[in-house]
Amino acid sequence: MLQKKPTLLTQEGLERLTKELEHLRTVGREEVAERLHQAFQDGQDDDFVDNAELEAARNAQAFLEGRIQELDEILNNYQIITEDMA
């Protein structure tokens, strides 16, 4: 497997991405879970094939998990840059 080059981050960028990841893992996942639950409950009376809200919630979940994975990859392979490196 090829080793990817590290992502170059400032200290501020690292902190921002770390906060975003924590937010997505907690609040983001909670919100998507609630949205999925609500769409599922609302869909009990409808035909699941035509449940647009359930499909939208599943898409939101896929996007969220993709972003979490992307941030994990960045934060597992980064290099802090400083002004003297620029």
Could you describe each region identified by the protein language model?
Residues 45-51, 78-86:
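Glycine/charge-rich, flexible interdomain linkers and switch-proximal surface loops
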